[in-house]
UniProtKB/Swiss-Prot annotation:
Family per similarity comment: Belongs to the glycosyltransferase 28 family. MurG subfamily.
Short name of one Pfam family: Glyco_transf_28
UniProt gene name: murG
Protein task: Cell wall formation. Catalyzes the transfer of a GlcNAc subunit on undecaprenyl-pyrophosphoryl-MurNAc-pentapeptide (lipid intermediate I) to form undecaprenyl-pyrophosphoryl-MurNAc-(pentapeptide)GlcNAc (lipid intermediate II).
Topology in membrane: Peripheral membrane protein
EC number(s) reported in the record: 2.4.1.227
Higher taxonomy: Bacteria, Pseudomonadati, Thermodesulfobacteriota, Syntrophia, Syntrophales
UniProt name for this protein: UDP-N-acetylglucosamine--N-acetylmuramyl-(pentapeptide) pyrophosphoryl-undecaprenol N-acetylglucosamine transferase
UniProt keywords, alphabetically: Cell cycle, Cell division, Cell inner membrane, Cell membrane, Cell shape, Cell wall biogenesis/degradation, Glycosyltransferase, Membrane, Peptidoglycan synthesis, Transferase
C-alpha cells in the first residue's frame, strides 16, 4: 500500500529533523510512497530539504506568541491566507495523512487537513507543548509524544508516547577523534548557533581542569561568534581541542564522546537517550514555557543526566562536574544505561506504523 504524506512544520532543526526521520522511514519502506514538506521561507527547511532531495511548499505565516502586539497582530492577519494556501496544497497533493511536527507552518496545514476531512497527527518534541500543538491536539486524530509528561495536555485516547524520531544516519557515525589509553572525550555544544553562556563558562573552567589537561580530548561547537576567542583560550591554557563554529556530522561527534555538555532542546535529549550518553545539561532559560528545563528534569529524575541551571553556571561548578565524571567511570556507565532506557530508536518506525493503521481505518 503506497501512501501520500504531508509533513508540515520546521523553522528550526528541532522541528524539522524529526519530520525528516519520518519521511525517510516512509521511503525506506516503499520508494513509491510520496512525501511533501510544507514550511516557511524563513526557516532552515528550504536549504536542508533541497540538499536531501525532498519537495517543499512554502506558506506565508509567522509566529504569534512572544512577538509583541504589533507583530502578533500582523501574524494573526496572515492566518486566513495561510489556511487557504494550505487547502490548495492539500487539494493538489491529495495526501492520505498530514503530520505536524511543530513550527509556524504546522498550524494552518494541519488545521486545513482537518477541515477537509483528511487524517491528521502531530508530533510534540517537548515535555511542555507549545500553544499551536495544544490547540491542534483538540482536532487531530493522533498525538505522538516524546515525553510521557506531555500526555496531560492531550486526550488519552489520542496520545501515545513514541519518542522523538531520529534519522537513521545518526546511528552510523564514525568517531571524529580516535581515543587512546585513558583519554576522556568531551563534546561541548549549544545547538546549531552555539551558546555564549556555555562557551564562557567552559573558558572559565579551563584553569580548574589543568590536572586533566593531558587526558581530555575536546570537541567544541561554539557558533560563529565565539569560535576564535574559544580557540585562543584553549591554546593559552595548553589544551588540545577541536574548536569549530558548526559540526555537520553530529553522529560522529556523539560517537567519540564520553560526556556531553549541552542545552536541553528536544532534539539533543532525543539523541542523548537514543544512543545512551551521559550529559551535563544547561537548559536555555528563555525558551517558551521554560520547556528546556522541563526536558532536562525528565532525565534528571531518572538519574540519566546532571543539570546546571544557567543562573548557577560557573567555570568552577562545570569543572567540578567534569572531574567527578572522570574520576568515577561507574557513574558514567550507569548514567549511559539510564539515558538509553529512556530512548526509543524505533520512534520514526512506530509513528509510521500508527499513521499507516490510521489511514486504513
Amino acid at each position: 500500500m503506497t501512501v501520500r504524506v504531508i509533513i508540515a512544520g520546521g523553522g528550526t532543526g528541532g522541528h524539522l529533523f524529526p519530520g525528516v526521520a519520518i519521511a525517510e522511514e516512509l521511503l525506506r519502506r516503499d520508494r513509491e510512497n510520496r512525501v511533501l514538506f510544507v514550511g516557511t521561507k524563513r526557516g532552515i527547511e528550504k536549504k536542508v530539504l533541497k540538499d536531501l532531495g525532498f519537495r517543499l511548499k512554502l506558506l506565508n505565516v509567522e509566529g504569534i506568541k512572544g512577538r509583541g502586539v504589533m507583530r502578533s497582530s500582523l501574524a494573526l492577519l496572515k492566518l486566513p491566507g495561510s489556511l487557504m494556501q494550505s487547502m490548495k496544497i492539500i487539494r493538489d497533493f491529495r495526501p492520505d495523512v498530514v503530520i505536524g511536527v511543530g513550527g509556524y507552518a504546522s498550524g494552518p496545514a494541519v488545521m486545513a487537513a482537518h477541515l477537509m476531512g483528511i487524517k491528521t497527527a502531530i508530533a510534540e518534541q517537548n515535555s511542555i507543548p507549545g500553544l499551536t500543538n495544544r490547540i491542534l491536539g483538540r482536532f487531530v486524530d493522533r498525538v505522538f509524544l516524546s515525553f510521557s509528561d506531555g500526555g496531560k495536555w492531550f486526550s488519552a485516547k489520542k496520545a501515545a508516547v513514541s519518542g522523538n524520531p531520529i534519522r537513521a544516519a545518526f546511528f552510523n557515525g564514525k568517531p571524529v577523534l580516535e581515543k587512546t589509553g585513558d583519554q576522556f572525550s568531551l563534546l561541548v555544544f549549544g545547538g546549531s548557533q552555539g551558546a555564549h553562556a556555555i562557551n564562557s563558562a567552559f573558558q572559565d573552567a579551563l584553569p580548574f581542569l589543568q590536572l586533566l589537561k593531558g587526558c581530555l580530548r575536546i570537541v567544541h561547537q561554539t557558533g560563529e561568534r565565539d569560535c576564535e576567542s574559544m580557540a585562543a583560550a584553549y591554546s593559552a591554557q595548553g589544551f588540545s581541542a577541536r574548536v569549530v563554529p558548526f559540526i555537520r556530522d553530529m553522529a560522529a561527534a556523539y560517537e567519540a564522546a564520553d560526556l556531553l555538555i549541552c542545552r536541553a532542546g528536544a532534539t539533543s535529549i532525543a539523541e542523548i537517550t537514543a544512543i545512551g550518553k551521559a550529559a551535563i545539561l544547561i537548559p536555555f532559560p528563555y525558551a517558551i514555557g521554560d520547556h528546556q528545563t522541563e526536558n532536562a528534569k525528565v532525565l534528571l529524575k531518572a538519574g540519566a543526566a546532571v543539570m546546571i541551571p544557567e543562573k548557577d553556571l560557573t567555570g568552577k561548578k562545570l569543572a567540578d562536574e567534569i572531574q567527578n565524571f572522570y574520576s568515577h567511570p561507574s557513574l558514567l556507565k550507569d548514567m549511559e544505561a539510564k539515558a538509553a532506557s529512556l530512548g526509543n530508536i524505533y520512534a520514526a518506525s512506530d509513528i509510521v506504523d500508527s499513521c499507516m493503521a490510521m489511514i486504513r481505518l
